[in-house]
Each structure stands twice: as structure tokens, then as C-alpha cells.
Regions:
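Surface cap/lid and interfacial helix-loop subdomains adjacent to catalytic sites
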Residues: 1-30, 37, 41-62, 169, ...
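Aromatic-rich transmembrane-lumenal/periplasmic boundary elements in polytopic membrane proteins
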Residues: 52-84
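Soluble catalytic regions of membrane-associated enzymes that act on cell-envelope
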Residues: 72-255, 264-277
């Protein structure tokens, strides 16, 4: 049997090599090497399910201790507006490493009052960890109870913020929002994994999207029950896998406005993100993949901006309805890593380079995929 399988694989390699010679005019040696690499990748893909499950199980055991740790200097909050406080339904010890960081940090009302020069409210931060309850449904029920307890639905803005793989939320983004609204804010999130993002990115994408959909549906359903004149503005934010998790809640763009979101910011969306990919494929003619334009930017826009002025230039034209902004960089491997890189040159490598990508980068079969993948894991 092994001999027969080997012969079949060898025949496939030879057939691929002949195709590569005709298609790309490669030398015999290079074509044979590339053909072998392709077959190896395909064989690995066939057994990937078994290997991936074992890898994820092993990674979970390795990184579980980190999730139970607490960063030096991080202490349990005593403010009732924070999950993990003595008044909270979510126990401090259950929030995970990143959850404890999130609820224990950030500006308080006193600091915001000093910075903005007017009386501020205490920002609300709601978070549930993997250990906060035994099931996804129980975690969502507790999360809604936390929102009610903390008064989150009475704030000016309510931000749903799906996390990255480890449960991380960008502290700069959270702080910026709280500064803008002088603390009249509530940010809500839920942990779905404790694995590093690059591991979750490679093997746990469906879980992130399912978790994002569950949290967004739960919070939005409760928000929609409020009288229209008493609802906070509903915002959505996500970075990297948090962006993919957020996109998992929507089949297409009209669902975002139908659910009542005022604005959406997705930073560094993974290439497999359903909405991002669909919009990019359907972008307006003659607009680049690295910074596409869709429907002339009426409701969705893309920016490579590195600072507020650049982003403002991309978003300064009047919007219509819900605002959706994708912030992405031309050198971000999370955005550009795709299985398609194995065998076809993407538009972003055929176009003039984006703001921070080297112009010397070229596409080569197989090689470019692994180059970008290595950058992702770096």
C-alpha cells in the first residue's frame, strides 16, 4: 500500500512539474521542487484536522497557567463600575490574565475630570472570562446581568469589543474612547480563548466568530428592548481576531445598520474575515486592494493612516448612515496572509506598495506564503 501511495504521489509531482514548466517557464529542477512542495502541503492539509486538534490541545495546556496569573501591580478594582469588583457578579479570579488587566486599569473619573476640565463619570468596563461561568450561555447571561448592574445601558455610548485570542483589548483604544466621552461610556467584552492570537488565528477562527456573534446578539437584543430615546449609542470595535469575531455577527453590511450600530472600527482584520474579504473583492473598479473604496465610501471606508490627520483625510467626506472603518497597514501579515498566496499573486503585490511595505517584495509560488506566515508568528 505504501509503495502504491508513493507512486501516485510521484506521478502527481511529475504532472505538476510539467504544468509549472509550461505555465511559468521554470527550469526542470525548480519545477520539480515546487511540485514536491505543493504535494507536501496538500498531504499535510489532508491530515491537518488530526494534527491541528492535537496541537491546539497541547497549546491550551501550555498557556493555561498564564491565563490564571495576574500581572504585577494589577489589583482588584474597588469601583462598582468594574467587573471583578466586590459588587460584581463576575469574580475577580475568573476573569483571566487579560480580563483582570482590562478592568483594573484605565482612567477614573478623577483623572478624566482633571484632563477634560469638567466633571466626569466613572467609566464602566464589563468583562467575563472563560472561568466566569461553565457554558457560553451562562457567560452571556452573567454578562447581561453585569451590564444591568453597572448601569451600562444608561451611558452615552455602549461599545461592544470582542477580544483577540488571549482575551486582550487594546488599552489605548479603550482609554481614547473614555477620554473622548469624559467617562460617559461602557465597554463590554467576553473572553473566548486563552491562546496567543497567532495560534488562534491558525486554528481557532470559527470559535472567535461564533463567540463574537453570541456576544453581539446578546447585548444588541437587550439594547433593542430599551425605549429608542433612552438607548446609548451602540458602537463596535475589534482589533485583529477581535475584528474577525465582530464580523462574524453579520451576514452583510445592511445587518450592521439594521441592528442599530452607529459606528464600527475594525483594526487589522484577518484576511479570512468574511465582511472584509467580501467588500475587498467587490471594491470599486480601479481602486487598490491595499486601500480599496467600496460604493464610493458612503458607509464603508479603508485607511492606511498612521496618525489622526491621515485617517481624517480618508474619512472627511460626509458619510451616509452607519459608519464602518477598516484600519489596515500594508505590512500587516494578519491582513494579507491567505492560502491563496501559495499559488496565485494577489493584487496587493501587483499594485504600487502601500505606505509601509517595501517596494522590493515580490511574489513567488509557495515562498511568499511562508514568508508572510513567518512574519505573522514573529
Amino acid at each position: 500500500v505504501c509503495v502504491a501511495v508513493a507512486r501516485v504521489l510521484l506521478d502527481i509531482i511529475k504532472t505538476l512539474a510539467r504544468f509549472l514548466i509550461r505555465r511559468w517557464h521554470l527550469s526542470d529542477e525548480v519545477a520539480l521542487f515546487v511540485g514536491t512542495a505543493i504535494v507536501v502541503v496538500l498531504v499535510i492539509t489532508l491530515i491537518n484536522g488530526v494534527l491541528l486538534r492535537g496541537f491546539l490541545a497541547g497549546a491550551s495546556r501550555v498557556f493555561q497557567p498564564q491565563n490564571t496569573a495576574t500581572r504585577e501591580g494589577v489589583v482588584q478594582p474597588d469601583r462598582p463600575e468594574r467587573s471583578g469588583s466586590p459588587e460584581s457578579f463576575a469574580a475577580w479570579d475568573s476573569l483571566g490574565y487579560q480580563g483582570r488587566n482590562f478592568v483594573a486599569t484605565g482612567p477614573g473619573a478623577e483623572e478624566l475630570t482633571r484632563i477634560n476640565g469638567r466633571p466626569a463619570k466613572e467609566p464602566i468596563r464589563v468583562y467575563v472570562g472563560l472561568q466566569t461561568a461553565d457554558t457560553d450561555e451562562a457567560r452571556m447571561a452573567l454578562l447581561l446581568s453585569e451590564l444591568e448592574r453597572s448601569g451600562a445601558f444608561e451611558r452615552e455610548v455602549l461599545v461592544i469589543a470582542p477580544t483577540t485570542g488571549t482575551g486582550w483589548i487594546n488599552p489605548i483604544a479603550s482609554r481614547a474612547l473614555e477620554l473622548m466621552y469624559n467617562g460617559d461610556t461602557a465597554i463590554v467584552s467576553s473572553q473566548y480563548s486563552h491562546l496567543p492570537s497567532w495560534i488562534s488565528f491558525l486554528g481557532d477562527q470559527e470559535k472567535s466568530m461564533a463567540s463574537g456573534r453570541m456576544m453581539i446578539d446578546a447585548v444588541q437584543n437587550r439594547w433593542a428592548q430599551l425605549p429608542a430615546d433612552r438607548r446609548p449609542r451602540l458602537l463596535l470595535y475589534g482589533e485583529s481576531l477581535g475584528s474577525m469575531a465582530g464580523q462574524g455577527a453579520f451576514d452583510w453590511l445592511p445587518d450592521i445598520s439594521r441592528m442599530g450600530f452607529s459606528s464600527v472600527l475594525w483594526v487589522g482584520p484577518p484576511n479570512a474575515s468574511p465582511l472584509w474579504r467580501g467588500i475587498t473583492v467587490r471594491r470599486d473598479p480601479r481602486t487598490p486592494e491595499v486601500e480599496p473604496r467600496y460604493d464610493n465610501g458612503r458607509t464603508v471606508r479603508f485607511s492606511q493612516g498612521n496618525d489622526a490627520s491621515q485617517i481624517a483625510a480618508d474619512t472627511g467626506v460626509p458619510w451616509e448612515g452607519t459608519r464602518v472603518l477598516f484600519l489596515q497597514h500594508a505590512s500587516d501579515p494578519v491582513v494579507w496572509l491567505s492560502p491563496d498566496l501559495l499559488f496565485s499573486r494577489p493584487d496587493w503585490l501587483a499594485e504600487p506598495p502601500g505606505n509601509d511595505r517595501t517596494a522590493s517584495m515580490r511574489w513567488y509560488p509557495i515562498v511568499t506564503f511562508w514568508q508572510v506566515a513567518a512574519d505573522l508568528m514573529n
